[in-house]
Amino acid sequence: MSRIGKLPIKIVDSVKVDIKDNIVTVEGKRGKLSQELKSSIKVRVEDSNIIVERSFDDKQTRAFHGLYRSLISNMVKGVSDGFSKSLTISGIGYRVEQQGTSLFFNLGYSTQFEYVIPEGINIRLDGNTKIAVEGIDKCRVGQVAAEIRGLRVPEPYKGKGIKYDNEVIRRKVGKSGVKK
């Protein structure tokens, strides 16, 4: 049995779970998410817990068992608490500003980057060097944060670029002078 898949998912009081035709819908105070399941995975609600089970025991179904359990768990956490990722911009003249539903980045290039904020994602700016990406879908929050980071990945010599708050940049030593 999958070690992750066999664990029950606790349902918070403010969350409502609906299962119809292999589609799990989770609704909470922050919004509504749904996930379509493979036919080999079955889900049931029992005593304020969600139980994920599989009908076959082949390798792929065992992998999907743990995957869908994690996805449903993230849906429950997302609609009740939400997810957040923080990014920091470091470098001389590097900054970000928000205009409507777009972010404009000055990252040391000759042109300014425009990033359109997708639906269902909230962006908070703290000054012009800190970005907080928030939303109910963990996958989309991580994807948006990765796309923003990808605009200027931190370089290893001075650490300039966009990095996650908890990320440690491996630094390299620069060129040493000519020895005589």
Curated annotation (Swiss-Prot):
Domain of life per record: Bacteria
CC annotations in GO: cytosolic large ribosomal subunit
Protein's UniProt keywords contain Ribonucleoprotein: yes
UniProt keywords, alphabetically: Ribonucleoprotein, Ribosomal protein, RNA-binding, rRNA-binding
Record-level Gene Ontology MF annotations: rRNA binding; structural constituent of ribosome
GO biological process, one term: cytoplasmic translation
Subunit structure: Part of the 50S ribosomal subunit.
NCBIfam families: L6_bact
Function: This protein binds to the 23S rRNA, and is important in its secondary structure. It is located near the subunit interface in the base of the L7/L12 stalk, and near the tRNA binding site of the peptidyltransferase center.
Similarity annotation: Belongs to the universal ribosomal protein uL6 family.
Protein name: Large ribosomal subunit protein uL6
